[in-house]
Design a protein with these regions (language model features):
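Extended, hydrophobic alpha-helical segments in both membrane/secreted and soluble proteins
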Residues: 128, 152, 302, 314, ...
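Glycine-rich, acidic and aromatic/proline-enriched surface loops and short helix-turn segments
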Residues: 114-121, 320-328
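Replace the tail clause
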Residues: 1-301, 307-308, 383, 439-520
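Long, polar/charge-rich, low-hydrophobicity segments
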Residues: 181-184, 327-353, 359-499
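Catalytic nucleophile-loop/oxyanion-hole region of alpha/beta-hydrolase
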Residues: 168, 314, 345-347
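Acidic, serine/threonine/proline-rich low-complexity intrinsically disordered regions
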Residues: 99-101, 165, 255, 259, ...
């Protein structure tokens, strides 16, 4: 503490001091060169982003943009139909992990609580519907999309670590259950489930009150009445779509709700019975196409579930998925887009290549063996990305019979191919100790995923080097792992021996989080 206080008071008197990868001191000449006007990239002697005093303010401006649109009553953004805001939530969570904004945490938890509690969530089997037609997350459009499951799994997994709420971990586990039970096609995942069953929207998912009562014993029925908002009139076409009364896993923060809550065992038993009954009904049709990019996002999310939610089955499933995607979609001729049975649609898209490269780059952080296993494939994918990049402009595709299609920069609803490619390439540059330029911050509503690269390239991700890898439970969420001979960490322009500070308690006051950040 005294050293920190001394530094805070006298830092203007202390000469710049950084470490090379071999832990020797960086020379003053190198530091002077890095500080020269117009210098945008790092030195190999100092494999961390150039740090600007404006970085934090720019990040906070993007958070403030989201705050202005945040629905403080219902969670989410805007005041009409509610779509899950995947990329804004990821940006806010990484910004919060970096200690940039306490308000980011409020927006994240308010939105995640609403989505998992109310009608967007399939409470019986896990997973999520496409969007809700109202602003309070009650009645969904009952379609289920693979990319929603992937990106919500990513978000809930991170949140389970950042905020230590059991409901977030349980929601992540429920998404994986839905993926395995309803989306799984061989070693990959199907694209979607229709909203209709026999031409009726949501018919598989909604209940008359008496249907629920006749399936349960009295104690179970009473527990359901206390857990969910149920009535004879219902909330959708005189039937009930299940909406919880209070967010699961948050009762520890609400003692009064905890006292009035039903026995969880009774609720669980009742829900199992209702799911069994639901399986006897006709089911929505499933779109059997396996889309490469969406499956690669599932892979990224499975790794997040392994790292942050502690789901033991997630990493082996991610490895199995990676092997399938590489063997099925990648060849020397290019990268295919869709598989349907034995048929491939071979047109190459930036979003597919970028998502797969990001997945394999994240997987390479898991072990030296996995790093080596996919090295050649990652190199091939980078070549394919280079073929989709002309004079600083990304192309979404190059059809053989048409002109090239310029890439859109917007996330709608999956991250843009541009943002996926940029983040994947940046992570590879970080892990290879290469020079890289800081990425610009982008509009937090339409291009939020690009801000992950902006944060990482400006030093807001820890770069942790070790010979054999470090348990993810010991690292902050905003960490990148590198395999090397030494043991060191870099953050916000400072490299030092050893690991980053242990993750802070999730409920630490915002002032303490800010104080810790400024000490580094």
């Amino acid at each position: 503490e005294r050293v920190i206080e001394f530094y805070a008071e006298h830092k203007h008197e202390i000469a710049p001091f950084e470490l090379n990868r071999d832990h020797s001191r960086v020379t003053e000449a190198t530091l002077a060169a890095l500080a020269a006007p117009g210098t945008a990239s790092t030195s190999k002697e100092l494999p961390v982003a150039m740090i600007s005093d404006d970085d934090e303010q720019e990040a906070l401006r993007r958070v403030a943009d989201l705050e202005r649109a945040y629905d403080r009553v219902h969670g989410g953004f805007g005041d009409s139909q509610k779509f899950p805001p995947h990329s804004p939530l990821l940006f806010l969570q990484y910004a919060h992990a970096a200690g940039l904004s306490a308000q980011a945490a409020t927006m994240v938890t308010g939105t995640l609580d609403a989505m998992m509690t109310r009608g967007l969530h399939d409470h019986l089997q896990g997973g999520f519907f496409r969007y809700t037609v109202d602003n309070d997350w009650t009645i969904p459009h009952f379609e289920k999309m693979l990319y929603d499951q992937a990106l919500l799994l990513w978000n809930y997994s991170i949140a389970s670590r950042l905020f230590a709420r059991t409901g977030y971990r349980e929601t992540a586990e429920g998404i994986i259950r839905s993926l395995e039970e309803t989306f799984r096609v061989g070693a990959g995942y199907a694209s979607a489930h229709d909203a209709d069953t026999n031409h009726r929207e949501g018919a598989t998912y909604i209940w008359k009150l008496e249907e629920i009562e006749e399936r349960l014993d009295p104690g179970e029925f009473d527990a359901m009445l206390r857990e969910f908002s149920l009535s004879a009139d219902g909330n959708f076409e005189r039937r009930n779509h299940l909406v919880r009364i209070i967010a699961p896993g948050t009762r520890e923060d609400n003692p009064d709700a905890a006292r009035r809550a039903p026995d969880p065992a009774l609720v669980g038993r009742a829900m199992d019975k209702l799911l069994a009954a639901r399986r006897e009904r006709d089911q929505p049709d499933r779109d059997e196409k396996v889309v490469l990019g969406w499956n690669a996002l599932v892979g990224c999310a499975l790794l997040a579930a392994h790292r942050y939610a502690g789901v033991e089955t997630a990493r082996p499933r991610a490895v199995e998925l990676a092997d399938y995607l590489v063997s099925t979609f990648v060849s020397a001729e290019g990268v295919a887009h869709v598989a349907l049975g034995d048929q491939l649609q071979n047109q190459e898209f930036l979003a597919d290549v970028g998502a797969l490269l990001l997945f394999l780059t994240m997987l390479a952080e898991e072990s030296a063996e996995l790093d080596h296993r996919y090295r050649d494939t990652r190199a091939l994918l980078e070549q394919r990305l280079a073929s989709l990049h002309d004079d600083g402009v990304w192309m979404e595709s190059r059809p053989t019979d048409l002109t090239a299609v310029p890439a859109e920069p917007f996330d709608q609803p999956v991250p843009s191919g541009m943002a996926l490619a940029e983040f994947a390439l940046l992570l590879r540059q970080i892990r290879s100790h290469e020079d890289y330029a800081p990425r610009p911050f982008a509009d937090a509503h339409g291009r939020a995923f690009a801000n992950l690269a902006a944060l990482a390239s400006r030093g807001y991700f820890y770069v942790v080097e070790s010979p054999e890898g470090v348990a993810w439970s010991s690292l902050p969420v905003n960490s990148v792992q590198v395999f090397g001979e030494g043991r060191s960490s870099c953050y916000r322009g400072v490299c030092y021996l050893g690991l980053p500070p242990a993750p802070e308690p999730p409920n630490a006051p915002p002032a303490e989080k800010t104080k810790r950040k400024r000490r580094r």
